[in-house]
Amino acid sequence: FTGQITAAGKVPPAKVMVIGAGVAGLAAIGAANSLGAIVRAFDTRPEVKEQVQSMGAEFLELDFKEEAGSGDGYAKVMSEAFIKAEMALFAAQAKEVDIIVTTALIPGKPAPKLITREMVDSMQPGSVIVDLAAQNGGNCEYTVPNQVTTTANGVKVIGYTDLPGRLPTQSSQLYGTNLVNALTLMTRARDGHLVSEFDDEGVRTRTTVRDGEITFPPPPSEVSAAPAPAAKEVAPVEPPPPPKERPW
Protein backbone atom coordinates (compact mmCIF):
# COMPACT_ATOMS: atom_id res chain seq x y z
CA PHE A 1 0.00 0.00 0.00
CA THR A 2 2.58 2.53 1.08
CA GLY A 3 5.08 4.04 -1.35
CA GLN A 4 8.81 3.41 -1.17
CA ILE A 5 11.95 5.23 -2.20
CA THR A 6 14.94 2.96 -2.77
CA ALA A 7 18.24 3.02 -4.63
CA ALA A 8 16.47 1.23 -7.46
CA GLY A 9 13.81 3.91 -7.81
CA LYS A 10 10.57 5.22 -6.39
CA VAL A 11 7.34 3.26 -5.97
CA PRO A 12 4.22 5.43 -5.52
CA PRO A 13 1.62 4.50 -2.89
CA ALA A 14 -1.44 2.55 -3.92
CA LYS A 15 -4.58 4.48 -4.80
CA VAL A 16 -7.76 3.17 -3.22
CA MET A 17 -11.36 4.15 -3.92
CA VAL A 18 -14.09 3.18 -1.46
CA ILE A 19 -17.73 3.36 -2.57
CA GLY A 20 -20.11 3.73 0.35
CA ALA A 21 -19.17 5.39 3.64
CA GLY A 22 -21.16 3.33 6.11
CA VAL A 23 -19.59 1.23 8.86
CA ALA A 24 -17.78 -1.10 6.43
CA GLY A 25 -16.72 1.71 4.13
CA LEU A 26 -15.27 3.84 6.92
CA ALA A 27 -13.40 0.81 8.26
CA ALA A 28 -11.92 0.19 4.80
CA ILE A 29 -10.91 3.84 4.54
CA GLY A 30 -9.20 3.74 7.92
CA ALA A 31 -7.36 0.50 7.13
CA ALA A 32 -6.12 1.69 3.73
CA ASN A 33 -5.08 5.09 5.09
CA SER A 34 -3.17 3.51 7.98
CA LEU A 35 -1.22 1.40 5.47
CA GLY A 36 -0.11 4.51 3.61
CA ALA A 37 -2.42 4.42 0.59
CA ILE A 38 -3.94 7.44 -1.12
CA VAL A 39 -7.63 7.00 -0.33
CA ARG A 40 -10.66 8.60 -1.92
CA ALA A 41 -14.28 7.75 -1.16
CA PHE A 42 -17.75 8.38 -2.52
CA ASP A 43 -21.19 8.26 -0.95
CA THR A 44 -24.52 9.57 -2.17
CA ARG A 45 -25.16 11.09 1.27
CA PRO A 46 -23.40 14.44 1.64
CA GLU A 47 -23.68 14.31 5.43
CA VAL A 48 -20.88 11.70 5.60
CA LYS A 49 -18.31 14.01 4.00
CA GLU A 50 -16.82 15.07 7.33
CA GLN A 51 -16.63 11.44 8.50
CA VAL A 52 -14.74 10.46 5.35
CA GLN A 53 -12.32 13.35 5.70
CA SER A 54 -11.78 12.62 9.40
CA MET A 55 -10.57 9.14 8.40
CA GLY A 56 -7.95 10.66 6.12
CA ALA A 57 -9.63 10.22 2.73
CA GLU A 58 -10.64 12.60 -0.03
CA PHE A 59 -14.41 12.86 -0.47
CA LEU A 60 -15.39 12.64 -4.13
CA GLU A 61 -18.27 14.94 -5.00
CA LEU A 62 -20.53 15.31 -8.00
CA ASP A 63 -21.47 18.55 -9.64
CA PHE A 64 -25.06 17.46 -9.13
CA LYS A 65 -27.50 18.30 -6.36
CA GLU A 66 -30.08 15.77 -5.20
CA GLU A 67 -31.35 14.71 -1.78
CA ALA A 68 -29.79 11.28 -1.20
CA GLY A 69 -30.54 10.48 2.44
CA SER A 70 -33.61 8.51 3.44
CA GLY A 71 -33.70 9.94 6.98
CA ASP A 72 -32.57 6.70 8.64
CA GLY A 73 -28.90 6.72 7.72
CA TYR A 74 -29.27 4.66 4.56
CA ALA A 75 -29.09 5.74 0.96
CA LYS A 76 -32.16 5.72 -1.26
CA VAL A 77 -32.64 4.95 -4.94
CA MET A 78 -31.37 7.93 -6.92
CA SER A 79 -32.63 9.48 -10.15
CA GLU A 80 -31.32 8.40 -13.55
CA ALA A 81 -29.52 11.71 -13.99
CA PHE A 82 -27.70 11.29 -10.67
CA ILE A 83 -26.76 7.69 -11.49
CA LYS A 84 -25.40 8.78 -14.86
CA ALA A 85 -23.24 11.42 -13.19
CA GLU A 86 -21.84 9.04 -10.57
CA MET A 87 -21.14 6.35 -13.17
CA ALA A 88 -19.09 8.88 -15.13
CA LEU A 89 -17.15 9.61 -11.94
CA PHE A 90 -16.50 5.90 -11.29
CA ALA A 91 -15.37 5.38 -14.90
CA ALA A 92 -12.79 8.14 -14.55
CA GLN A 93 -11.57 6.88 -11.17
CA ALA A 94 -11.29 3.25 -12.34
CA LYS A 95 -8.55 4.24 -14.77
CA GLU A 96 -6.48 5.75 -11.94
CA VAL A 97 -6.93 3.60 -8.84
CA ASP A 98 -5.34 0.27 -7.95
CA ILE A 99 -7.97 -0.99 -5.50
CA ILE A 100 -11.75 -0.48 -5.38
CA VAL A 101 -13.79 -1.45 -2.32
CA THR A 102 -17.55 -1.39 -2.82
CA THR A 103 -20.01 -1.45 0.09
CA ALA A 104 -23.14 0.11 -1.42
CA LEU A 105 -26.42 -1.46 -0.28
CA ILE A 106 -30.05 -0.31 -0.34
CA PRO A 107 -32.32 -1.95 2.30
CA GLY A 108 -34.75 -4.44 0.78
CA LYS A 109 -33.29 -4.21 -2.73
CA PRO A 110 -30.51 -5.91 -4.72
CA ALA A 111 -27.13 -4.22 -4.57
CA PRO A 112 -26.84 -1.50 -7.23
CA LYS A 113 -24.45 -2.19 -10.11
CA LEU A 114 -21.91 0.61 -9.88
CA ILE A 115 -18.79 -0.88 -11.50
CA THR A 116 -19.45 -2.00 -15.06
CA ARG A 117 -17.43 -4.45 -17.12
CA GLU A 118 -16.11 -1.56 -19.20
CA MET A 119 -14.78 0.15 -16.06
CA VAL A 120 -13.02 -3.03 -14.93
CA ASP A 121 -11.55 -3.56 -18.39
CA SER A 122 -10.04 -0.06 -18.21
CA MET A 123 -8.19 -0.79 -14.93
CA GLN A 124 -4.48 -1.62 -14.77
CA PRO A 125 -3.42 -5.29 -14.65
CA GLY A 126 -3.02 -6.45 -11.07
CA SER A 127 -5.76 -4.17 -9.75
CA VAL A 128 -8.17 -5.56 -7.18
CA ILE A 129 -11.90 -5.04 -6.55
CA VAL A 130 -13.29 -6.11 -3.17
CA ASP A 131 -17.07 -6.36 -3.46
CA LEU A 132 -18.50 -6.35 0.06
CA ALA A 133 -22.02 -6.34 -1.40
CA ALA A 134 -21.54 -9.73 -3.10
CA GLN A 135 -24.14 -11.42 -0.91
CA ASN A 136 -26.83 -9.13 -2.36
CA GLY A 137 -25.71 -9.54 -5.96
CA GLY A 138 -22.63 -7.34 -5.88
CA ASN A 139 -21.82 -3.79 -6.95
CA CYS A 140 -19.56 -5.01 -9.78
CA GLU A 141 -20.82 -6.71 -12.93
CA TYR A 142 -17.93 -9.19 -12.80
CA THR A 143 -18.71 -10.29 -9.23
CA VAL A 144 -19.49 -13.97 -8.68
CA PRO A 145 -20.63 -14.71 -5.10
CA ASN A 146 -18.13 -16.80 -3.09
CA GLN A 147 -15.52 -16.67 -5.83
CA VAL A 148 -12.46 -14.69 -6.88
CA THR A 149 -12.76 -13.81 -10.55
CA THR A 150 -9.75 -12.80 -12.64
CA THR A 151 -10.65 -10.83 -15.74
CA ALA A 152 -8.90 -11.02 -19.11
CA ASN A 153 -6.85 -7.91 -18.29
CA GLY A 154 -5.66 -9.29 -14.95
CA VAL A 155 -8.04 -7.58 -12.50
CA LYS A 156 -9.10 -9.68 -9.51
CA VAL A 157 -12.70 -9.31 -8.32
CA ILE A 158 -13.23 -10.72 -4.81
CA GLY A 159 -16.83 -11.75 -4.13
CA TYR A 160 -16.59 -13.55 -0.80
CA THR A 161 -19.82 -13.58 1.20
CA ASP A 162 -18.37 -15.17 4.33
CA LEU A 163 -15.86 -12.51 5.38
CA PRO A 164 -16.92 -12.59 9.07
CA GLY A 165 -16.36 -16.36 9.06
CA ARG A 166 -12.85 -15.86 7.69
CA LEU A 167 -12.01 -13.85 10.82
CA PRO A 168 -13.74 -15.99 13.46
CA THR A 169 -11.89 -14.67 16.51
CA GLN A 170 -12.43 -10.99 15.77
CA SER A 171 -16.01 -11.56 14.58
CA SER A 172 -16.88 -13.45 17.77
CA GLN A 173 -15.36 -10.73 19.95
CA LEU A 174 -17.28 -7.96 18.20
CA TYR A 175 -20.54 -9.94 18.17
CA GLY A 176 -20.19 -10.77 21.85
CA THR A 177 -19.51 -7.13 22.71
CA ASN A 178 -22.65 -6.07 20.86
CA LEU A 179 -24.74 -8.64 22.73
CA VAL A 180 -23.38 -7.49 26.10
CA ASN A 181 -24.13 -3.86 25.29
CA ALA A 182 -27.63 -4.71 24.06
CA LEU A 183 -28.47 -6.67 27.21
CA THR A 184 -27.03 -3.89 29.37
CA LEU A 185 -29.44 -1.43 27.78
CA MET A 186 -32.41 -3.70 28.44
CA THR A 187 -31.47 -4.71 32.02
CA ARG A 188 -30.40 -1.44 33.57
CA ALA A 189 -31.29 -2.58 37.09
CA ARG A 190 -28.90 -5.53 36.66
CA ASP A 191 -31.53 -7.87 38.09
CA GLY A 192 -31.98 -10.03 35.00
CA HIS A 193 -35.40 -8.56 34.11
CA LEU A 194 -35.75 -7.15 30.62
CA VAL A 195 -37.26 -3.67 30.43
CA SER A 196 -38.34 -2.20 27.10
CA GLU A 197 -37.90 1.53 27.46
CA PHE A 198 -38.86 3.08 24.17
CA ASP A 199 -37.13 6.34 25.02
CA ASP A 200 -33.89 4.51 24.23
CA GLU A 201 -33.46 4.20 20.47
CA GLY A 202 -31.28 1.11 20.79
CA VAL A 203 -34.03 -0.72 22.67
CA ARG A 204 -36.83 0.61 20.48
CA THR A 205 -35.29 -0.59 17.22
CA ARG A 206 -34.76 -4.10 18.63
CA THR A 207 -38.26 -4.58 20.03
CA THR A 208 -40.83 -6.39 17.87
CA VAL A 209 -43.58 -7.11 20.45
CA ARG A 210 -44.30 -5.42 23.78
CA ASP A 211 -47.22 -6.27 26.09
CA GLY A 212 -48.84 -8.30 23.31
CA GLU A 213 -48.67 -5.41 20.83
CA ILE A 214 -46.65 -5.63 17.62
CA THR A 215 -44.21 -2.71 17.60
CA PHE A 216 -42.30 -3.58 14.44
CA PRO A 217 -41.19 -1.88 12.26
CA PRO A 218 -39.84 0.92 14.44
CA PRO A 219 -40.04 4.53 13.31
CA PRO A 220 -37.10 5.60 11.13
CA SER A 221 -34.09 6.81 13.04
CA GLU A 222 -33.21 10.40 12.42
CA VAL A 223 -29.53 10.89 11.63
CA SER A 224 -27.51 14.04 11.42
CA ALA A 225 -27.79 15.56 8.00
CA ALA A 226 -25.47 17.93 6.27
CA PRO A 227 -26.14 21.41 7.59
CA ALA A 228 -27.81 23.73 5.16
CA PRO A 229 -25.54 26.55 4.05
CA ALA A 230 -26.19 29.66 6.06
CA ALA A 231 -27.64 32.53 4.14
CA LYS A 232 -25.03 35.20 3.65
CA GLU A 233 -25.93 38.59 4.97
CA VAL A 234 -25.81 41.18 2.27
CA ALA A 235 -24.16 44.32 3.48
CA PRO A 236 -26.10 47.49 2.72
CA VAL A 237 -24.74 49.36 -0.25
CA GLU A 238 -23.43 52.73 0.85
CA PRO A 239 -23.95 55.62 -1.53
CA PRO A 240 -20.77 56.90 -3.16
CA PRO A 241 -19.19 59.96 -1.51
CA PRO A 242 -20.09 63.30 -3.05
CA PRO A 243 -17.54 64.68 -5.50
CA LYS A 244 -14.95 66.99 -4.03
CA GLU A 245 -15.27 70.65 -4.88
CA ARG A 246 -12.45 71.88 -7.05
CA PRO A 247 -11.12 75.45 -6.97
CA TRP A 248 -11.40 75.70 -10.74
Language-model segment annotations:
Residues E47, A85, A92, Q124, ...:
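Charged, alpha-helix-enriched surfaces in structured cytosolic catalytic cores
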Residues Q4, P13, A134, C140-E222:
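Adenosine-phosphate binding glycine-rich loop
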Residues F1-Q93:
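Glycine-rich phosphate/diphosphate-binding loop of Rossmann-like nucleotide-binding domains
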Residues N33-L35, M55-A57, T116-S122, V144-V148, ...:
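Short, solvent-exposed amphipathic alpha-helical segments in soluble enzyme
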Residues A228-W248:
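Cytosolic-side membrane-insertion boundary helix
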Residues K49-E50, G69-S70, K109-A111, G137-E141, ...:
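Short acidic/glycine-rich loop or secondary-structure boundary segments that cap or lie
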Residues I99-I158:
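ADP-ribose/adenylate-binding Rossmann-like module
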